[in-house]
């Protein structure tokens, strides 16, 4: 019984020691594995950077190859023949109005001993900073003309710059393509310069006409409005007419009055007239009536003396 506690204590001391001894190598292995993983993660970006550098180094030769190819393409373009000479003349000067015809003449001189076959004539607008970039390519003019040695030929060409190109510079390239009897192809850049397309000033377009019509209508509307405003201020109130009646009896229409009423009105007027005459008639005495009767009985005087005697008689009667 005394050994049991000692064995138990020994077991408790020996078991942790055994566990520690077994876990020691494993733990160190795990730590070593973690360290190796970290080293691998550090080494991976280095490897990726090396790959990128290799790709850049690989791209550089390709870019150089492309530039060389472009130079070869440019150098492979046909050039002008030393046995030929070209000249150009713009008919209306070196002005290039937008949306208007530009015409020029190209002269070709054969200075060699063999015939030249002039095939075509073309023109194009290009970007001023890069002549390989086309802005507007015009139609090539087929010629197919044989120019004998020591002879000249003149060709006419015309084109119309687009209207949106007005006011901007462009590179104008005019090429004359020809070949000899052996099949050698030549190309002469007759004109290769930067020009400015000018805006068209002459003439009236639809937008300008519409703008002028709109402004004219607006001005007319303003004038009419001001006129109406002034008239409304000057306008006076209308004068009310007062009925004054008829000024004379002739203006009255009696046809609608019955005839009986008219007779009564006429009879009343006659009575009123008689009464008025009686009121205004002077009072004459009987002697005056007698003198008047005497005057009627007197003979008509023929001379001045007779008139005088008649007046004396009347004076005797008391008139």
UniProtKB/Swiss-Prot annotation:
<comment type="similarity">
    <text>Belongs to the TRAP-alpha family.</text>
</comment>
<comment type="function">
    <text>TRAP proteins are part of a complex whose function is to bind calcium to the ER membrane and thereby regulate the retention of ER resident proteins. May be involved in the recycling of the translocation apparatus after completion of the translocation process or may function as a membrane-bound chaperone facilitating folding of translocated proteins.</text>
</comment>
<feature type="transmembrane region" description="Helical">
    <location>
        <begin position="209"/>
        <end position="229"/>
    </location>
</feature>
<keyword id="KW-0325">Glycoprotein</keyword>
<keyword id="KW-0812">Transmembrane</keyword>
<feature type="modified residue" description="Phosphothreonine">
    <location>
        <position position="261"/>
    </location>
</feature>
<feature type="signal peptide">
    <location>
        <begin position="1"/>
        <end position="21"/>
    </location>
</feature>
<feature type="topological domain" description="Cytoplasmic">
    <location>
        <begin position="230"/>
        <end position="319"/>
    </location>
</feature>
<dbReference type="Pfam" id="PF03896">
    <property type="entry name" value="TRAP_alpha"/>
</dbReference>
<comment type="subunit">
    <text>Heterotetramer of TRAP-alpha, TRAP-beta, TRAP-delta and TRAP-gamma. Interacts with palmitoylated calnexin (CALX), the interaction is required for efficient folding of glycosylated proteins.</text>
</comment>
<feature type="region of interest" description="Disordered">
    <location>
        <begin position="35"/>
        <end position="84"/>
    </location>
</feature>
<feature type="glycosylation site" description="N-linked (GlcNAc...) asparagine">
    <location>
        <position position="192"/>
    </location>
</feature>
<keyword id="KW-0597">Phosphoprotein</keyword>
<feature type="topological domain" description="Lumenal">
    <location>
        <begin position="22"/>
        <end position="208"/>
    </location>
</feature>
<dbReference type="GO" id="GO:0005789">
    <property type="term" value="C:endoplasmic reticulum membrane"/>
</dbReference>
<feature type="glycosylation site" description="N-linked (GlcNAc...) asparagine">
    <location>
        <position position="137"/>
    </location>
</feature>
<keyword id="KW-0106">Calcium</keyword>
<dbReference type="GO" id="GO:0005783">
    <property type="term" value="C:endoplasmic reticulum"/>
</dbReference>
<feature type="modified residue" description="Phosphoserine">
    <location>
        <position position="248"/>
    </location>
</feature>
<dbReference type="InterPro" id="IPR005595">
    <property type="entry name" value="TRAP_alpha"/>
</dbReference>
<protein>
    <recommendedName>
        <fullName>Translocon-associated protein subunit alpha</fullName>
    </recommendedName>
</protein>
<keyword id="KW-0256">Endoplasmic reticulum</keyword>
<feature type="compositionally biased region" description="Acidic residues">
    <location>
        <begin position="35"/>
        <end position="76"/>
    </location>
</feature>
<keyword id="KW-0472">Membrane</keyword>
<keyword id="KW-0732">Signal</keyword>
<keyword id="KW-1133">Transmembrane helix</keyword>
């Amino acid at each position: 019984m005394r050994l049991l506690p000692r064995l138990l204590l020994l077991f408790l001391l020996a078991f942790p020691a055994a566990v520690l001894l077994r876990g020691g190598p494993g733990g160190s292995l795990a730590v070593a594995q973690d360290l190796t993983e970290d080293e691998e993660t550090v080494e991976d970006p280095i490897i990726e950077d090396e790959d990128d550098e290799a790709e850049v180094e690989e791209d550089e030769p390709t870019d150089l190859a492309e530039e060389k190819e472009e130079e070869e393409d440019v150098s492979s373009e046909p050039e002008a023949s030393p046995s030929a000479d070209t000249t150009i003349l713009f008919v209306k000067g070196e002005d290039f109005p937008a949306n208007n015809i530009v015409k020029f003449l190209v002269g070709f001189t054969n200075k060699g001993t063999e015939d030249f076959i002039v095939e075509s004539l073309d023109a194009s607008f290009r970007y001023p900073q890069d002549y390989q970039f086309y802005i507007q390519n015009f139609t090539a003019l087929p010629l197919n003309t044989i120019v004998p040695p020591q002879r000249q030929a003149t060709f006419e060409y015309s084109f119309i710059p687009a209207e949106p190109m007005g006011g901007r510079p462009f590179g104008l390239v005019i090429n004359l393509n020809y070949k000899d009897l052996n099949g050698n192809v030549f190309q002469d850049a007759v004109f290769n310069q930067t020009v400015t397309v000018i805006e068209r000033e002459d003439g009236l377009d639809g937008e300008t006409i519409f703008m002028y019509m709109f402004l004219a209508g607006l001005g007319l509307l303003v004038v009419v409005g001001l006129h109406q405003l002034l008239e409304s201020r000057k306008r006076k109130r209308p004068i009310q007419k007062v009925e004054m009646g008829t000024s004379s009896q002739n203006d009255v229409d009696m046809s609608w009055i019955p005839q009986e009423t008219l007779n009564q009105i006429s009879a009343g007027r006659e009575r009123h007239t008689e009464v008025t005459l009686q009121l205004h008639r002077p009072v004459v005495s009987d002697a005056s009536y007698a003198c008047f009767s005497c005057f009627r009985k007197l003979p008509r005087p023929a001379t001045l003396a007779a008139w005088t005697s008649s007046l004396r008689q009347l004076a005797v009667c008391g008139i």
